[in-house]
């Protein structure tokens, strides 16, 4: 028998979350007197660990897909996706431009080197592009001072038949926090004033909390929701459920051993947990080699037999220990939910480990089998 651990992915939850985002944007558009933006469903990092092909089927109602890897983009085309695809980091070599041309893939353009490669290209089809502004995150994009010239260079490539539509995009650094995105939005507006083409500025956090930035009248807007489509929250202060989102990934395991621990005895590496009373301790078939955060400490939530309990001591490579006192009927073979449907929120587990839900979902180990939920 295989080791008792697996991840369940719910296509129903994926579809539901896309619908929630769409309805949220529709309401914002009505309030602003504008048109609802189009949605690029972000499926980078193997669809945040959920599987590219699975996400393709679930997000069939999205207007487009956004990702990083050109090979994943080609897989989407070969799997039958006919809508727009955007490469968020753009391309890296002249040979990549051949693939953009052959598979009708759109690209971000964020540096002069990419413009230079495009200027030397002779594609058989026009390539759509989004010229990226560095509005303050200082990651990718042209500076506000250089943006006008970069956009004009892209328009020249459009006139030369290399590029098709040319749009404007940026990425918000603080849409998930109290500072908000307004400071970057003002930089973006100033740098792009009077420039034509579609606009894309909203990530998951901005889509959920500041949808008016993409729902007002004027240019065609595209939003780029990612983590929220998978049922996790981009915010540390607001759970995904507050937006009506459902977890798409559930990590399940089992109790594979039970220990009777006496008062004063310790549990796990480093003896970091000492029992204050006699207690039952369950050994779970999941560890940090499966993608569970090693830094999660005693008290991290976990569910056994449908009952909330807690992690005890340090997480091992292949196992972890949990408190079975709240679950007196649980023994070997009892089902365990580490995160997801019927268990703790992935963001709560991540917070206990000093990280974010994004990391847990994308770091699920290859040795963990992944199944579709029925």
Swiss-Prot record:
Cofactor(s) in the UniProt record: pyridoxal 5'-phosphate
EC code: 5.1.1.1
GO molecular function, one term: pyridoxal phosphate binding
Active site positions: 44, 269
Name of this protein: Alanine racemase
Keyword vocabulary terms for this entry: Isomerase, Pyridoxal phosphate
Family annotation (HAMAP family): Ala_racemase
GO terms for cellular component: cytosol
Positions of substrate binding: 139, 317
SUPFAM superfamilies on file: Alanine racemase C-terminal domain-like, PLP-binding barrel
Organism: Bordetella avium (strain 197N)
Purpose: Catalyzes the interconversion of L-alanine and D-alanine. May also act on other amino acids.
Keyword Isomerase: yes
Any GO BP: D-alanine biosynthetic process
A Pfam family: Ala_racemase_N
Annotated family: Belongs to the alanine racemase family.
């Amino acid at each position: 028998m295989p080791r008792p651990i697996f991840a369940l992915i719910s296509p129903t939850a994926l579809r539901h979350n896309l619908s929630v985002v769409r309805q949220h944007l529709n309401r914002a558009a009505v309030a602003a007197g504008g048109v609802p933006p189009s949605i690029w469903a972000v499926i980078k990092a193997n669809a945040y660990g959920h599987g590219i092909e699975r996400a393709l089927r679930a997000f069939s109602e999205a207007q487009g897909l956004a990702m990083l890897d050109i090979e994943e983009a080609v897989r989407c085309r070969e799997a039958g996706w006919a809508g727009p695809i955007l490469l968020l980091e753009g391309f890296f070599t002249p040979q990549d431009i051949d693939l953009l041309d052959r598979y009708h893939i759109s690209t971000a353009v964020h540096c002069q080197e990419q413009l230079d490669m495009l200027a030397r290209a002779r594609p058989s089809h026009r390539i759509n592009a989004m010229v990226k502004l560095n509005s303050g995150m200082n990651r990718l994009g042209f500076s506000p001072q250089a943006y006008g010239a970069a956009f004009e260079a892209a328009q020249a490539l459009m006139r030369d038949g290399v590029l098709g539509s040319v749009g404007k995009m940026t990425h918000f650094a603080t849409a998930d926090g109290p500072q908000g995105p307004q400071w970057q939005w003002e930089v973006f507006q100033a740098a792009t004033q009077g420039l034509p083409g579609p606009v894309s500025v909203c990530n998951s956090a901005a889509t959920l909390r500041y949808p008016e930035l993409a729902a007002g009248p004027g240019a065609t807007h595209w939003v780029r929701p990612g983590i929220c489509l998978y049922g996790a929250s981009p915010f540390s202060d607001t759970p995904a459920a507050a937006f009506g989102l459902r977890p798409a990934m559930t990590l399940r395991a089992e109790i594979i051993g039970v220990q009777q621990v006496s008062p004063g005895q310790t549990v796990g590496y480093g003896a970091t947990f000492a029992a204050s009373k006699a207690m039952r301790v369950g050994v779970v078939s999941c560890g940090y080699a499966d993608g569970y955060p090693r830094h999660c400490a005693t008290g991290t939530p976990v569910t056994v037999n449908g009952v909330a309990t807690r992690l005890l001591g340090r997480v091992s490579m292949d196992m972890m220990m949990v408190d079975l006192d709240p679950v007196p009927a649980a023994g070997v073979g009892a089902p365990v939910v580490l995160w997801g449907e019927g268990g703790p929120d992935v963001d709560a587990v991540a917070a206990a480990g000093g990280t974010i839900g994004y990391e847990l979902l994308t770091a699920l180990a290859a040795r963990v089998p992944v199944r579709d939920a029925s």
